[in-house]
């Protein structure tokens, strides 16, 4: 077991139950990792030693591919918990519904799960959105519908595709992890690459890369766009035109599963949205605060600005620099009613450069912490207007994940 974090621990527990005779070794480069009382461990600088001696190597999704040995014999042995999970549930006859995409996968997966549940079916929402899927093998019966949010990390070493696959969108992302756009696309493609006949893939045809990936499937291919959404945004609790695409995907998949249309529409109307995704935190200090901590690319922050319109007065941007192009975001900000931009370290300096290459109407500020950013926003934002947290960058240089970033945002607002 390579990597002994949350997913690695869940995988080891699953092996104890479903492969009790397996001889397990745990490997992790973190020398301070929690020790297992039963199994040998390879930690620190020697964590990748003697991999050729193992029959199966299960890699945790957080391990960048370039850290693993490139030896062909070793690469052939590498798999992941996603592969093990999909193979196991296929043997039980359960329906797997995998959702991937640079953006929109969490909301789309949650919408599908809500609709299927509304139809009275047994459903589990697992994967990148919550608990490791492998931890729920005991919960799966023949008639269970498993909705999996699948990141490129989780698809990386997978050689089994879900029964139903969905590609919501495609933007350059996680390039520091994958090493290149080609590797990122190849990982995403595993959601379709191993689909046999009798399966189906749904893809957003506005993204050429999604269509290329869909062609790899031997299953039924179904295209969708935002125009296929069965409701207007105003008829739901969702914000932003991009959610039309998410509703379109969810409704098309649900119809394929023979869910009646009235059931689909009812579930879409009742769906309340997800935390940290254009989530209004209410009015504090006379200002409306919107948490869009999930947005870690320029494209998703542009979508957030489009969703909220002219009420955004202050925006908090920046974080870990993944080399993204911020020129289109700069144009969008200059074309909006945004007056103040607060920049975090890292990509903040390149966002500043992009903004300063055009007109200099907008006032720029720097903040070294969330507390400093929120205090600035309290002073700068006009009453009744919006302060938006949508950083257009990941924030691993400051926070554990986007959830922690959003939670810290709320804490600072409430002080």
Describe the predicted segments one by one:
Residues 1-11, 25-33, 274, 293-362, ...:
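Active-site beta-alpha connecting loops in nucleotide-dependent enzymes
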Residues 1-80, 84, 239:
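N-terminal leader/targeting and accessory segments in enzymes
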Residues 11-14, 18, 122-123, 236-338:
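Nucleotide phosphate-binding/pyrophosphate-handling subdomain across enzymes
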Residues 16-17, 48-54, 61-200, 205, ...:
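Phosphate-binding loop of NTP-binding sites
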Residues 22-24, 53-56, 122-123, 196-201, ...:
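Short active-site oxyanion
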Residues 23-28, 124-125, 147, 223, ...:
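Short beta-strand "acidic-cap" motif of Rossmann-like dinucleotide-binding folds
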Residues 31-36, 49-50, 63-69, 207-212, ...:
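Short, charged/polar "capping" segments at the starts of alpha-helices
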Residues 36-46, 73-79, 94, 215-233, ...:
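Active-site regions of enzymes building and remodeling cell-envelope glycoconjugates
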């Amino acid at each position: 077991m390579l990597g002994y974090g949350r997913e690695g621990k869940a995988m080891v527990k699953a092996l104890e139950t479903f492969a009790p005779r397996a001889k397990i070794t745990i490997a992790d480069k973190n020398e301070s990792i929690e020790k297992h009382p039963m199994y040998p461990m390879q930690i620190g600088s020697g964590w990748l030693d003697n991999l050729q001696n193992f029959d199966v190597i299960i890699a945790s999704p957080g391990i960048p591919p370039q850290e693993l040995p490139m030896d062909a014999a070793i690469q052939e042995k590498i798999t992941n918990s996603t592969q093990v999970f999909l193979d196991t549930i296929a043997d039980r006859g359960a329906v797997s519904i995998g959702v991937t995409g640079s953006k929109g996968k969490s909301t789309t997966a949650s919408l599908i799960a809500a609709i299927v549940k509304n139809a009275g079916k047994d459903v589990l929402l697992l994967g990148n959105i919550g608990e490791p899927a492998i931890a729920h093998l005991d919960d799966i019966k023949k008639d269970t519908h498993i909705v999996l949010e699948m990141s490129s990390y989780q698809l990386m070493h997978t050689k089994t595709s879900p029964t139903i696959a969905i590609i919501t969108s495609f933007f350059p992302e996680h390039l520091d992890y994958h090493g290149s756009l080609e590797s990122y696309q190849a990982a995403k493609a595993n959601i379709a690459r191993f689909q046999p006949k009798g399966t189906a893939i749904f893809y957003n045809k506005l993204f050429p890369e999604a269509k290329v990936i869909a062609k790899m499937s031997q299953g039924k291919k179904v295209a969708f766009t935002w125009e296929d959404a069965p409701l207007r945004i105003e008829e739901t609790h969702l914000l932003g035109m991009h959610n039309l695409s998410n509703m379109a995907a969810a409704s098309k998949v649900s119809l394929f599963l023979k869910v009646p249309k009235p059931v689909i529409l009812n579930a879409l109307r009742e769906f309340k949205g997800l935390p940290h995704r254009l989530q209004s935190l209410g009015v504090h200090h006379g200002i409306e605060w919107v948490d869009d901590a999930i947005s870690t690319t320029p494209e998703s922050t542009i979508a957030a600005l489009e969703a909220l319109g002219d009420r955004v007065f202050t925006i908090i941007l920046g974080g870990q620099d993944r080399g993204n192009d911020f020129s289109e975001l700069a144009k969008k900000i200059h074309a909006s009613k945004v007056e103040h931009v607060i920049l975090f370290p890292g990509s903040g300096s390149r966002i500043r450069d992009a903004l300063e290459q055009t007109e200099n109407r907008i006032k720029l500020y720097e903040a070294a912490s969330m507390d400093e950013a929120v205090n600035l926003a309290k002073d700068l934002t006009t009453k009744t207007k919006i302060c938006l947290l949508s950083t257009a960058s990941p924030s691993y240089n400051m926070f554990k994940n986007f959830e922690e970033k959003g939670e810290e945002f709320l804490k600072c607002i409430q002080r």
